[in-house]
Amino acid sequence: MIICMILVSRIAFFKDAEFLRAVRDTMGKNRMSLAHKREKPIKGIIWKKNLKKMNFLSINFKDYHVKDISDLEYFKNVETIILTYMGDNEEDIGMYNEEHILDNLNKVRDFNKLRRVQLYHLNADDSVKKECPKAMVFID
């Protein structure tokens, strides 16, 4: 029973199904990005220790309709976070209408290695910078 509890405590349980889909589709050795999308999604268990190895995380909400970014808490050693809403070409730009998408950005507040946060085409203002005091925050 104790061994089972220890094993379960090492598994990443995602609150947002689209965030999980993004991880399964784009997670590499130490980065998560659509630029390096996998041929086949990862199947099975996602271990917390593998997410801690990520130093770069990028999610395009045009492809993954994430509503809750609190799952960022698993990426404790990330250095760069890019959250964006963009299509394949420059004309295909809009604003992500998920009003509260950045409500849980405070999950990264104590990430010691976080140096850069880029937010593109999201409902964000300068108050977001308070959630990431150790990082340079770029909003467009």
Each predicted region: which residue ranges?
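N-terminal capping/linker segments that flank leucine-rich repeat
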Residues: 1-140
